[in-house]
Every structure is written in structure tokens, then in C-alpha cells.
Amino acid sequence: MSRPKKAIFYAILAAIVLVALEIGASAFLYAVNKDRIAALPGAPSEPAILLALRTGLSWLLPGSFPDPASYRRMTRLPAGFFAEDAEQGYRANPGRYIFRYSGMRQGKVEHLDAVVTINPDGTRLTGKMPADAARRIFVLGDSYVFGDGVNDQQTFAFLLQTEFPGASVQLHALAGYSWANALVTMQRIKDRIRPGDVVILGYAQYYKERHVAAPARLRSIRDWMASTFPEVELDPKDRVIRARLDTSNRLALDTIPMHCKFDPAYCAGPEPAPDYVDRVSSELLRAIAASTPEKIHLLHMFGAKNDPVLRNLPANVEIVAATPQDFSYVMQDNIMGLDDHGGPYWHYAMYSKLRPVIIAARQ
């Protein structure tokens, strides 16, 4: 065989081997990641062979070969941010904390620090409040509403406190919370809500699986903990709230183990039917609305406009449309790519929707 023919033969052979290796690596990566494909940020940025090699090396030498595309860590300093709560499942301990978000850029780990201050009553700091406020603005919701990823002074609740210095803005929100938690909070604070006060209730379509503590929700917690807090030892005392309809179709609340490790059968169980989840969610909203005669401003942050839960609202509930589609500009920033929560631009966008609503409520 002549040299040119040999060169062509070996080139074709090498190409076939590379294609076979790429196909094999792709199959390997699919088998490893099939349970979390939907949660991945997008298409891979590197050949499957390199990704498979990195995955294999990370198994042999844990932590030595992190994937730059998916490497994210979060640390709360000091430890002890969360505490048990018999009704809510968990709550925040008072104190001043640093939320540290880490990621990889150009092969190096970098981090961003956010200051988080929790008041003695468990609310997040929103700024200087008058001792005798003319009215209170109660804000309830999840990690987006709480302001995961941003400093105390960057949350939309802080911006509202600055805009309305005569009011007292009280931020009752926390990561992982939903309307089930909001109902418990409303039962605790309802006697403090006076005529003229404002209640802001966060909502996103993903709240619904939290309401019923769906198995898919617990599996997402499992995967998130494994990727973001790999060094944290799971505690069997960690619990999440669950709303359900009892045998008489009445709303009931309880708590269940947060981690699949301690109830694997539940995590592997069937998902509740969508219409049941919607019914539970609607009952939660009705119960929250019944806690006060004051208007509740439902801050719709994410999800479809035709969400069944947003139909036939209680008389004292009014939607504040604040999804990304409700803005004429791109406002869905994040924490410099180190976290998916809304950054300062997102919080200002929420503030811009709520400010006129609160002004109108005062008139």
C-alpha cells in the first residue's frame, strides 16, 4: 500500500475510532446524568469524551476535576442559619450571615459574598423602620422574595422601605417556602394586620409542587444538595411543610422528612395529579385570603398567565403581573452566573411593579 493510501486509511480509521469513542462517551454521560438532564443549563460546551474523562476522574479523585460548566457551591457563614420549626418545617435563626456563592471561571474558583441579616423575629432586615409606623407592609414568599444572592440593601423589600420611610416593611420569606408556609405565617401575624396595611404574597408556578411536597420536589432538593452542598451531612430532623386535602376535602397541613435518604419510598412514589395540586394550591390561597379582610397583592413572578390557580381568585386578592414577559426590557439577571436567583436588576423590577400598587392602596 502506497504512503498516501496508508495516510488516508489511518486518517479514516482514527476518525471512526473518535466517533465511536464520542458515541460511547455520550451514552456513558446519559446513563450518569439521565435523572437531572432537565435541570442542566444547556447543551454541553465540550466534547463528550472530555466530559466523560472528567467525570471518571472526579469519581476516582473526588473534587480534583470539577466540571467548570456545572461547578457551583454555596456556603452560609457562620453555620447554623436554619433552625427547626414544628409548623413551618424550618426557619431562619437571627443573626448576621454571609451567603457565599462560588463558581469556576477559566479554571479558577471565584466567589461572591452577600450580607444577610435576620431580625430577632425571623424576618430579613429591610432597613430603618419607624418605631410607630403609620402602616405595615407584609411581604411573604420564597427565596426570590427573600433575596437569595443579594445583599440586604438590594432586595425589593429594602427598596420599598426606602421609598416608604413612614411604613414598616416586614419580609417574611425564606428559601424553599411556598403558600403553605405563608398560611402558617399569616395565622401568626393576622392579629397585627390593621386596616390600611399592605400584604404582598409571592407566587410562581413552581410553588405548586412545594405545596403538596411532591416526590419530584424532594428529588430536586436531593440533587441540589448533592451538587451545591456536597460536604453537608443530611439531618433526619430536616422537614418540609406539606398541604393536603383530608378525607372530607378540607385543607390540612403537616411536615414530612426533607431528604429522600430518610424516606426513599416516598421519593420514588407517584406524583400527585395536576388537578389535585391545583385544588390544594387554590385552597391555600383561599385560606390565606380569609386570614385578613385587607387586600392581598399577589406578586406573580414566574409562570403562565392561564395558570388554573390564578382563576376565580378570592375577592380581596389582586394580581400584580411581574413575570419576565410583563416587562418591556430584559430584567431577569442572576448572581453573576454563580446562582440562578434574581439579582439587583430583578429586584428593582419587582419594586417598580409594587411601588405604584402601594401608592394607590394609600389613597
Predicted regions and their residues:
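Short, amphipathic alpha-helical "lid/cap" segments that border enzyme active or binding sites
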Residues: 179, 183, 278, 282, ...
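Serine-dependent acyl-ester chemistry module
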Residues: 36, 40-54, 60, 204-314, ...
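Membrane-interface motif at the C-terminal end of an N-terminal transmembrane signal
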Residues: 18-37
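Conserved SGNH/GDSL esterase-like catalytic core that processes O-acyl groups on lipids
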Residues: 146-224
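Membrane/wall-proximal cationic-aromatic binding patches
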Residues: 37-159, 327-329
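Histidine-centered active-site loop/cap adjacent to the catalytic His
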Residues: 2-3, 7-10, 25-29, 334-363
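Alpha-helical scaffolding within the catalytic cores
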Residues: 123-125, 182-190, 283-285
